[in-house]
Swiss-Prot record:
NCBIfam families to which the protein is assigned, alphabetical: PRK09194.1, proS_fam_II
Keyword entries, A-Z: Aminoacyl-tRNA synthetase, ATP-binding, Cytoplasm, Ligase, Nucleotide-binding, Protein biosynthesis
PANTHER family in the record: MITOCHONDRIAL RIBOSOME PROTEIN L39/PROLYL-TRNA LIGASE FAMILY MEMBER, PROLINE--TRNA LIGASE
Annotated protein name in UniProt: Proline--tRNA ligase
Oligomeric and partner information: Homodimer.
């Protein structure tokens, strides 16, 4: 391929809306162009990268017995109503009507429609296990699309669904996909970490995310060092060992204290001369299961995902001032669990161990001192409710946890019978008994993987593509295209590399050498072959993008040397 014939519209200025490295570089290097908020056109270079990522994915899915299909993007609302997710998904679901007034959606996931498909064609245990996958456009009406390909409204995903006879079969399928995902991301040249994760609206009992470690990642991952136990989890799912009081105290009599205008933990600590770990925060929420109060220590934050799971709520949001006053009789800042009626109490397990703590008194300008859980308020639901932070003790071994930011590029789920039971997907076992099919779901964000690779592989000059997914492995750059010797040797280098099966681009544009060198670094070809003054001696210069190492080689050694570098 010749650069003079290829669409690589590099930019000299970075668009103002580009916030993260991948967004800036993919725009500047001519990989993508914005069509609308969260919607991008993928230009030829990006399409080449995507094809390579998809080839790796297909090879690994096929190796495990996966069969590729293509499901419809537009899905009838009837299926989503049957599964119960039509209303759960909320405003993120693109909804539309056809000319007859029938409701449809643009699929953000495909659990319902693939369950319906298998229902029609799988009847017997002899047809199981079954692995079906697709690589397909997905749609999600993000409230705030941002970061280019990392959080868009239209994106490409691979999703595979497993169908098994029982939980033992699901465990085999889950392990196969888990290991296949590790190979996919390793082959793509990414540094990643599998972590425990919450299942979210897709549901199921067990889930893991595959996180590409990058400072720009939206997700926070906590993990135990690998020389310890290796525990790792998304912060939404992460647990830690509950901290118990360091000194033993006897419970004291409950005492009401005036705290005029002291609404925040910081205000109360300063006024009473105590630390935040002696205070219990009581935070009210409105949910579809009724009002609830989350209780955490004053130096902790509520993990709302854990809270939602603990009470089995579909929706929850923090109560507003009017609701707080109606439920407690007090303004914001003075809520507490003592005497709080008609509200379900969900207590973090650290709070359950506290003695003689301080809480709001459910009356204006007042707090209680010497509150003791179980004595002064009921321990209705006790669970790990806090948001885990760095240096909390690991739940498995007790070592201090580390934290890093990551980009989720894949997630695997044990769905169990969540969809098969509500939608009626069953099979007949060897005794003729009807049983629900046990399902798993396994997704990879293809466009997100492309962007994550850039986030992890770049420098001040531009992208540094891992060789396996680079748009071209080699760029040949003649310094002076008007020099007949240089042009002839560049053509020869291009020809011998192409004939050897190396993906190579010849930059034959009549540009200054500096422009072509900058573009080569910006686009991120793993290897640059420069044809300059040494062309008269039949020599070319090889330069590795990732470290700048260079070497002069003769044209006869070029193919073997390039293969060695790559």
């Amino acid at each position: 391929m010749r650069a003079s014939e290829y669409l690589i519209p590099t930019l000299r200025e970075i668009p103002a809306e580009a916030e993260v490295v991948s967004h800036r570089l993919l725009l500047k290097a001519g990989f993508i162009r914005k069509a609308a908020s969260g919607v991008y056109t993928l230009l030829p270079l990006a399409h080449r990268v995507l094809r390579k990522i998809m080839r790796i994915i297909r090879e690994e899915m096929d190796r495990q017995g996966g069969q590729e299909i293509l499901l419809p993007i537009m899905q009838p609302a009837e299926l989503w109503l049957r599964s119960g997710r039509w209303h759960v998904y909320g405003p993120e679901l693109f909804r539309l009507k056809d000319r007859h007034g029938r409701d449809f959606c643009l699929g953000p996931t495909h659990e319902e429609i693939i369950t319906e498909l298998v229902m029609g064609d799988v009847r017997s245990h002899k047809q199981l296990p079954l692995l079906l996958y697709q690589i397909q456009n997905k749609y999600r009406d993000e409230r705030r699309p941002r970061f280019g390909l990392l959080r868009g409204r239209e994106f490409i995903m691979k999703d595979l669904y497993s169908f098994d006879r029982d939980e033992a079969g699901l465990e085999v399928s889950y392990r196969k996909m888990f290991e296949a995902y590790q190979r996919v991301f390793s082959r793509c040249g990414l540094e990643f970490r599998p972590v425990e994760a919450d299942s979210g609206p897709i549901g199921g009992s067990v889930s893991h995310e595959f996180m590409v470690l990058a400072g720009s990642g939206e997700a926070l991952v906590v993990y135990c060092p690998e020389d310890a136990c290796g525990y790792a989890a998304n912060v939404e799912k992460a647990e830690s060992r509950a901290e118990r009081p360091k000194t033993k105290e006897d419970p004291l009599a409950l005492e009401l204290l005036p705290t005029p205008g002291k609404r925040t933990v910081e205000d109360v600590c300063a006024f009473l001369g105590v630390g935040p770990e002696q205070i219990v925060k009581t935070i009210l929420y409105e949910t579809d299961r009724g009002p609830c109060a989350a209780l955490v220590r004053g130096d902790r934050e509520v993990n709302e995902v854990k809270l939602q799971n603990a009470i089995g709520a579909m929706h929850l949001e923090m109560a507003g001032p009017a609701t707080i006053e109606r439920l407690t009789g007090a303004p914001v800042g003075f809520t507490g669990p003592v005497g709080l009626e008609g509200v379900r109490l969900v207590v973090d397990d650290e709070v359950s161990f506290m003695v003689n703590c301080i809480t709001g008194a459910n009356r204006g300008d007042a707090h209680y001192r010497n509150v003791n859980p179980g004595r002064d308020f009921p321990l209705q639901v006790v669970t790990d409710l806090r948001l885990v932070r760095e240096e909390d003790p690991c739940p498995q071994c007790g070592r201090p946890l580390l934290a890093a930011r990551g980009i989720e590029v894949g997630q695997v789920f044990k769905l169990g019978t969540k969809y098969s039971e509500v939608m009626g997907l069953t099979y007949l076992d060897e005794h003729g008994t009807e049983r629900p099919v046990v399902m798993g779901c396994y997704g990879i964000g293809v466009t997100r993987t492309l962007a994550a690779a850039v986030e992890q592989n770049h420098d001040e000059q531009g992208i540094i593509w891992p060789t396996a997914i680079a748009p071209f492995a080699v760029v040949v750059v003649p310094v002076n295209v008007r020099d007949e010797v240089q042009s002839a040797l560049a053509e020869k280098a291009y020809t011998v590399l192409s004939e050897a099966g190396v993906e190579v681009l010849l930059d034959d544009r009549p540009e200054r050498p500096g422009v072509k060198f900058k573009d080569a670094d910006l686009v991120g070809y793993p290897l640059r072959v420069t044809v300059g003054k040494t062309a008269v001696d039949g020599l070319v210069e090889l330069r590795l993008r990732k470290n700048g190492d260079t070497r002069l080689v003769g044209i006869g050694e070029l193919v073997d040397t390039v293969r060695g570098f790559l």
